[in-house]
Amino acid sequence: MASQQEKKELDARARQGETVVPGGTGGKSLEAQQHLAEGRSKGGQTRKEQLGGEGYHEMGRKGGLSNNDMSGGERAEQEGIDIDESKFRTKK
């Protein structure tokens, strides 16, 4: 655990706009960044539970293909990469 002095230094850096917690981008203080990172982690885990491991993996493949010019689906189609969107369905 960080000492009180380290926490103060990290908080000061966060208030200057620096991201000091992985996943805490956008937080205006150390505490805010910690809460953002925790929420993002839980959100991803919940989505993975909803889709299942295979669906989550397929969605990541599709998202990883996207760029500024085209979506992941467009690029996959253009390059002949098969994305099985049937795996995207939430489990019931």
From Swiss-Prot:
Tissue note: Expressed in embryogenic cells, somatic embryos and seeds at the later stages of development. In the embryos, expressed in the procambium, the root and shoot meristem and the protoderm of the cotyledons. Not detected in the endosperm or the aleurone layer, in young leaves or roots.
Tagged with keyword GTP-binding: no
Keywords from the UniProt entry: Nucleus
Segments of skewed composition (Basic and acidic residues): 1-16, 37-61, 72-92
Region: Disordered, residue numbers: 1-92
Induction comment: Up-regulated by abscisic acid.
Protein localization: Nucleus
One GO CC term, this protein: cytosol
GO term, biological process aspect, one: response to abscisic acid
Nucleus listed as a keyword: yes
InterPro entries tied to this protein: LEA_5, Sm_Hydphi_plant_seed_CS, Small_hydrophilic_seed_prot
Extra information: Completely disordered protein. Flexible and unstructured in solution.
PANTHER family according to UniProt: EM-LIKE PROTEIN GEA1, EMBRYONIC ABUNDANT PROTEIN 1
Record family assignment: Belongs to the small hydrophilic plant seed protein family.
Protein's name in the database: Protein EMB-1
Source species of the chain: Daucus carota
Gene it is expressed from: EMB-1
